[in-house]
Structures are given as structure tokens and as C-alpha cells.
């Protein structure tokens, strides 16, 4: 019989906001701070909100205008409740605001520094490695990890709770950042213990929350928990489908699965297995399974949300820039692709114009707020061979864009995917297909064209490698195309970003 395993999940608390506080010499648990690029519109999403601001009812991924409105509302209430209906100061510190109810709530809006967050995350991972071997750690995101600690508890003579506390306090001592942890008998249980149960647990003096679950305590504590979207892997779409059967808790899902599992498989396919297992608190995946996993198919993806609605031509410029960057990324990774996909999302206001509304005959859908919006344009383009050529990939994207994008509408989101990505050595072997001759065609001309194309691709490849070398040595903006200076181009700005935010 397999021994029961013990897993720990650790989530760094309001990570980006905590890093910004630490860099300013401030206490992350006592400082009102949001990480947001105020140079963008107030609709920009806050990447992080400090715990003290969350205590005022501000969501962790609120939009900036929601923060502004909530703080304004809170300050109006403070002003009204003040003895003279006036505010006599302001502060960004939670303890001062608690002591002075007639002060205005203030906050810092810190621009994101993605390279800095990566540095902190790397340092914290190094601290985890003092206690746990890399083969027993899975990095889930920049601020979250899973650990299989089963084989460490006996040698450390600690419980999982004690080990979690020790690691978190080591991180706090060396970085100033605290964390929340979940402990479970499988990967799913430690995750939901951290995400749901720990949020309602009492904090210690360092702001640390730790919760533990096994299959039975999971059923007692969380079978009646709402909403379902709080649970790992259940999004709004899945929750809506389950609600059609009157299922709004994990307990109801577990009971439903006893007699109606074929219906769940019909609705969700293979994902029904995860839903049913998780409803009962089961998870068969082990750390060794994660480490051994190798995807069958590989792809490279690039996407961006434009800062304002773009015209058809401006959107084409951005799509071409992205195609060029994708090709360079393939060259850098020594990969090639034979299939390109383009998805273009339209701006919500595209149909506000009565003339456009009258002329537009394309498909529509509803956004999450129930508003009628044009349906995202989507198309694929099979290439004639495996390639990393910027010329061929840009041509493919340009053709796709012209074919699928409606010039009447404003563009807001662009995503490009290179599918069937394989190593270039294998790709070159796949490309070595003989030229098929035809008695009724000029075969010599066909040979000559194929040879000329090979020379052009070889010449372009040398140029791409030289471009990458220059960019590595002197910065990404040291060598640019004329395209990058066209109206609407975003490439130069994105070269100074990581993940769409300032580095």
C-alpha cells in the first residue's frame, strides 16, 4: 500500500506589492500600495494590492478606477463620521489610519518592475532549496510553489506545519516578504487549503496563515463552500454549466457524480474526471508525474492588449511586428514551425457607431458584462515547410490578417501562435523532400526557383542571427525595422517590457 504523502503549497503574500514596499523600506503589511501603471488609462488592471488595502474591500486584481472610487467612497464616509465633518490629515499606513479615524486614506501607486520581481522570486527559490531538493519542488508561478515534503519530515523531526513556518520565516528574514501556506495529503488539497481555508485562518505576528486539509476535513469544511470559482480549475464557464443542474457546491457535485457521472463526461469530456476527483478531495497526480511530463505538441505564443482601439491598418502594423519578433524567438530557440494562427479581438466600442452597426453583418457575442460585442476573428495558415523565416511568417500573418479582420471594426487584442514547433535539425530533415517533376512543366525553372528560395532563406537566417547578437549585446532597441516606426507600432515599447509591463 502506498504511503500517504504530504504536500506544502506556499504563496507569497501580495508579492509584487510586497516587493515594492520592501524596496521603499516600508512594511508590506502596514502600507497601502497598489502596483499599477498610472501612465495607462484608469481601466488598467492593478497587478497587486497590499494586504492593508485589501482589508478595505479592494480586490487583488482590481482595475485602477475601482481603487480610486473605493478610496473616495471610504474617505467620504470618514469625513461624514468625523465630529466636524472634516478630514485633518492623510496617511498610507494602516496603523495610523486606525488611530486617526478623521484622516484620509491614501495609497502609493507603484509602477511595475518585472525584472525586480523575477530577481526576488529567484532569491526566494534559492531559500527553498536550503530545505527541499529541486526534484521535490514545482514552481507553479512567480510567487507560488508546490513541495512534496513527505521524505523530509522524519529527517528534520518536524511536522509539515513546523517546516512550512520555518521556510516562510527564512524568506521573511532575508527578503521582508511573508507568505500563506497550505498543507494537504495531495497536491489539490494543499492548493485549496492555501487558496480558501488559509484566508480565514488567524495570522501570526508576521502575518503568516497556514491551513491543513485531508480528504475528510476537506469534505467537512469545503463541501458547502460557495462560490465554486474559488476552487482550483473551476472557472466561470464551468460553474455556469454546473449551475444548470443545480450544482453550486463541491458537496452537490460529489453527490451528483454518484449516479450521473456519464452526464458530466458528456458535458466536460476528460475534464469531468478532474471535477469528480476534486469534488471528493482526490488527486492522483504526484510530484514525479509533474517532473516527468513532456508535452506532445509544442507552440510559441505572443499576445498583447492594445492601450486604445486601433484602426485596421494600425493593427496590421502591430501584427507584423509581433510576427517578426516571433520569428526571431524561433531562431533564438533553434526551433521551426509549419503552422501559424492569428486571433484578433475587437474593441467593445466598435459597434457604438450607428453607421458601423448598420453595415456590420458579422457574428457577435456577449462579453462578461452581457454587452453585445463583435466575435473575435480567428484563422490559421499552414506554411509550405518548417521555417523560422521572418519574411515567410510575416507574409503569412499579413495574409491572415487581411482575410479575417473586418476593416470596419476597431482592434484591441492580437494573439499570434506558432504551432507544431520542433527542433530545427528535425525540421530540416522534414523539409528535405524531393522536388516532384512534371512532364508538362518547366522542371528546370522549378529547380532554379527552389534553389533561389534556399539561398534567400540562408541569407535571411544569417541576418536574423546577426540581429539577435546585436540585440543581446546592445539592447533590444539597438536594431529596429522601419516598421517599428510606423503609426501604431508598439515594438519599441514592448522591447522595454517583461510580460507586457515595464521591466
Give the residues covered by each predicted segment.
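Basic, low-complexity intrinsically disordered segments
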Residues: 1-503
